[in-house]
């Protein structure tokens, strides 16, 4: 019973916060409607998901079918595999605002998009945990949050 009451209070609080402080679109930075998608309907088509073929190491879009991009063939990475959600040039301003302008709500949008677009890939990999890359203390103090942790939380939901 108490658990249900806490859940209801939490939902009321969340609803109030969304009404008082609506989120911002990660593409145009305009205000988005509460309780809807976390992106403007006009902006959604501007984001082009990276589709095959892509580099098996870094996830970068490839012009032709092959295993690795030119960078990964000549460079060693500290990871085995990565995937790219969108073309970088389409989301670069958004990533900048997410990292340096306090737009933590972008993490919810991108985390949900990661789950939607990369869910099959993540399911095949079957991770035991999702661990965000830690930030240096100075950067964490300056920004006030770890953007990788925002993404990991949203993806974990």
Please identify what each model-predicted range represents.
Residues 1-157:
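Glycine-rich phosphate/pyrophosphate-handling loop used in enzymes and phosphotransfer proteins
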């Amino acid at each position: 019973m108490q658990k249900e009451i806490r859940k209801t209070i939490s939902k009321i609080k969340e609803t109030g916060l969304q009404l008082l402080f609506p989120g911002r679109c990660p593409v145009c930075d305009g205000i988005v409607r509460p309780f809807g998608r976390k992106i403007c309907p006009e902006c959604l088509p501007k984001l082009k998901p990276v589709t095959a073929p892509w580099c098996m190491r870094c996830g970068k879009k490839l012009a032709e079918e092959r295993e690795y991009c030119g960078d990964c063939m000549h460079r060693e990475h500290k990871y085995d595999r990565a995937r790219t959600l969108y073309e970088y040039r389409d989301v670069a301003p958004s990533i900048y605002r997410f990292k340096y302008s306090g737009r933590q709500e972008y993490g919810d949008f991108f985390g949900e998009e990661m789950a939607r677009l990369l869910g099959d890939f993540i399911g095949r990999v079957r991770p035991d945990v999702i661990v965000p890359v830690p930030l240096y203390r100075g950067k964490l103090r300056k920004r006030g949050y770890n953007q990788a942790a925002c993404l990991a939380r949203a993806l974990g939901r």
